[in-house]
Amino acid sequence: MKTYMASASTIERKWYVVDAADYTLGRLASQVAAVLRGKNKPTYTPFLDCGDNVIVINADKVKVTGKKLDQKVYYSHSDYVGGLKETTLKEMMEKKPEKVIELAVKGMLPKGPLGRQMFTKLHVYAGPDHEQAAQKPEVLKF
């Protein structure tokens, strides 16, 4: 009997929708990253993008514990001298709540071309509505 190895042409992709309301940020991000990688499937193959598409709604209602709202800082750089910008989690949740979940999930995916390809299957929306209704996504519970 031979060991089964999935190929890019045999992978079936599903669409899932996750309601981020009442979930903790890190716990939600780790579960979403596992689905994006395909680790929830028996046909998981480390060197292939065998994950599913995930839609996250209500990103503005995600919870964080402790004093992270005031103490967690996101850094970005403009590539100019003195161009380091700092943004707290509280400011980010007010301006771009989608970016908070995207950054958390992106940090849990592999670094490199395969991780970037997996990240393209993540769709995050601040409110309860999304644009992927035509794909008929299934509700994903953790």
UniProtKB/Swiss-Prot annotation:
Free-text function comment from the UniProt entry: This protein is one of the early assembly proteins of the 50S ribosomal subunit, although it is not seen to bind rRNA by itself. It is important during the early stages of 50S assembly.
GO terms (molecular function) for this protein are: mRNA binding; structural constituent of ribosome
Native source species: Lachnospira eligens (strain ATCC 27750 / DSM 3376 / VPI C15-48 / C15-B4)
Subunit (UniProt): Part of the 50S ribosomal subunit.
GO terms (BP aspect): negative regulation of translation; translation
Q: Gene Ontology cellular component?
A: cytosolic large ribosomal subunit
The protein's superkingdom reads Bacteria
Under the heading Gene3D superfamilies, the entry gives: Ribosomal protein L13 (3.90.1180.10)
- Could you tell me which PANTHER family the record lists for this protein? LARGE RIBOSOMAL SUBUNIT PROTEIN UL13M, RIBOSOMAL PROTEIN L13
Q: What is this protein called?
A: Large ribosomal subunit protein uL13
List UniProt keywords, sorted A-Z: Ribonucleoprotein, Ribosomal protein
> What is the similarity comment for this entry?
Belongs to the universal ribosomal protein uL13 family.
Coiled coil spans: none
**Record InterPro entries:** Ribosomal_uL13, Ribosomal_uL13_bac-type, Ribosomal_uL13_CS, Ribosomal_uL13_sf
One Pfam family recorded for the sequence: Ribosomal_L13
